[in-house]
Amino acid sequence: MKFFKKFFDYEYKELEKFKKVADQIMELEPVIEKLTDEELKNKTQEFKDRLTNGEDLEGIKVEAFAVAREAAFRVIGEKPYYVQILGGLAIHGGNIAEMKTGEGKTLTSTMPAYLNALTGKGVHIITVNEYLAERDANWMGNIYRFLGLTVGINFRESTPKEKQEAYNSDIMYTTNNELGFDYLRDNMVVRAENRVQRPLNFVIIDEVDSVLIDEARTPLIISGGRIESANLYIDADRFAKKLKENDGYIYDEKTKAVTLDEKGIKEAETCFKVENLYDLNNTNLVHYINQALKANYAMKRDMDYVVSDDKIIIVDPFTGRLMAGRNYSDGLHQAIEAKEGVTIQQETKTLATITFQNLFRMYNKLSGMTGTAKTEEEEFREIYNMYVITIPTNRPVARQDYGDLLFATKEGKYKAIVNEIKERHNMGQPVLVGTIAVETSELISSMLKKAHIPHEVLNAKNNAREAEIIAKAGEKGAVTIATNMAGRGTDIKLTDEVKELGGLCVLGTERHESRRIDNQLRGRSGRQGDPGMSQFCVSFEDDLMVRFGTERAKDMLARIGFSDDVSIRNKMLSNSIEAAQKRVEGNNFDIRKNLLQYDDVINQQREYIYERRNEILDSDSIHDSVLDTFHNYISDLVSSHIMPEGYLTDNDLSEILEFSNEHLLKKDLSVEELKNKSIEEVTELLYSKVIEEYEQKLSEIPEEITKEFEKAIVLRVIDTHWMDHINTMSNLREGIHLRSYAQVDPLRAYTSEGFELYDDMLNTIDKDITMYLIKSEIRQNVERKQVIKGEAVNDNNKVKKATPKVVNKIGRNEPCPCGSGKKYKQCCGK
């Protein structure tokens, strides 16, 4: 087998390459150790000079790793082990380094981060929360500062100036959420100097599976512009609560989909007084009903969300942490609020959005590290073009992983778990109990209280003391009940006495749908060669077992007298559980892949719009571009009147003139001026007249103001239509799956119709830019004229810079600018 591995196993070949380089780095150790602190620091400038003179990162890699390794020892007293060098090389190569818990991923990242920061293009280190970002920046940051590099931390509460400084640092620590929101905000600014990011170069994502897999289905959204809909959610909720399963609605355990059956459809039509529920005019009603069904029958309180202070707070299904400030999209959050009887927030309009999949694929080089990635390596390779390299442990793993204990019922399982905890607690062995849901952790806690066993509970309702609770979880006699949140971030360290007692005992109360999450729980025990054990207890009533049909096995065991309190350890049943997990993982991968295919459609559009915005912001003047827009619009205007035979009739010319004289020109053109002219000549004549009047208007205004004026109008038009387009695409996406009933591929239909909508949007943008710029007047006061001349000063004797005041001429039949939706003549123009 080893012979075949040498030729066909990518991971094996990469590790062999890394070992050769790691040997060279280790050989340099005696030389680097002899350098003084000053000589070691000077190496950074030497490396930068060599890069400037044409050498590449591969040429300085061995020396740079050796320097970073020695600096770590001098600054924090820790020198990366040989296996950590291997991990660092995997990360530098744009791979994922899979390193077991306690193997020192944080220290491992310092070597590739230092090497890549030498280019001056910036390195971003992403963590899952701000606590870890600050901890790692303060801890590892001292190594980089010692070597002459700058280190920044980007927080949610940082000011724009602080964010700019952080992004301009050689190495920046931040969270995946803040990175994404900064990207979206940068593409909404109206001045170039307000952007905080620079081009995305190299990123190291800590807990990469959490960011790129678990959160891949959750888009980042910046929203605004409120929509009134609270009563509709209440009405839909009332209706949904009247229905019964299989007698009004159907619930699919495997997919968690809830749909109306025939009876439910008829009841909906009666309740809401509509003839045909699925008529196109009832699209919104169907949406509210569907969300109410999902809220009431698929979303579980204290598992998917908690209710706190009149608010619905989402529970992260993979970490168990509360996600304050996050809302379910598409009205599901409001539907849950209606279900729970809390205040219903107003729905908002999406202003900007992106998925983590497309955000991180914008980096020149993407890498990561985690303890659990191997089960998802196909997805990492296919979506992100990253390989998972499993790094050997520094010491052999001494933890004992036992096969699953299977019980008939949950009640029997929980009793057995409490008895096991009691036995281990009496021995003094620390126990970590892993649960999936808040309600399970609270149930186990109440049973332990009755048994008079002291313990700590760590769940979404009680996460303020997370670091403290986890740090003490390895003490003698400690019993800790935790949701999945205990899986990341803080090591559980053991005393010698606890090691003698067998180390940390990990008990899982049920299998998660992802093997990776189970492996994370196991990995809390047995760090760096410590002793320990792990055991999962499952029952036929667990969600995973119910979803994947284990009724036949349950019946068989019942026939042979398998009672509630008896457990069995059966390899065949354990394999069937793992097979069920693989099916769920495969299904989830397909969902994420499908999401990406749809998101790629709007991502191409987003890239063009954002590129156009940045060109506008970075240009000194966009006047030539504005004139091109005028020409495009006038050309489209004329083309839209051309007869199929390829000419313009007198009637067509009259229509073009009527529109032009009313909307584009102050000085009217006559039909005679256009008669007997070719289509190109008509276009050019109209264009020349529009330009003549427009240039005349601008000639009366100082050049600096006209530059600002054009930029402000163009950006406002682009942003307005782009935001509308995002919501239009979202609406298209919501119903596109119905096309499959007509034998039409939904993705192909979404792509085709999405680009038609996009083309329409671009044409509308050209039209509105033309209209706004031609119709707008710029008023300036005396102070503004003085500003342009550099004369106006404020109390501190500094020149003031004001923004141009733009006033639009509004036609009486145009929408009122107050946002009421009425015509101007029927609203503010009365």
Model region roles, listed by residue range:
Residues 109, 417, 801-803, 811:
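Active-site-adjacent structural elements in folded domains
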Residues 433, 481, 722, 758, ...:
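Hydrophobic, well-ordered secondary-structure elements that form the walls
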Residues 376, 429, 477, 605, ...:
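Generic detector of short, well-ordered, non-transmembrane alpha-helical segments enriched
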Residues 806-825, 829:
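Short Cys/His-rich zinc-binding micro-motifs
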Residues 32, 306-313, 319-326, 528-529, ...:
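Extended, charged helical/alpha-beta scaffold domains that provide interaction surfaces
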Residues 1-561, 610-611:
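Conserved P-loop NTPase motor core
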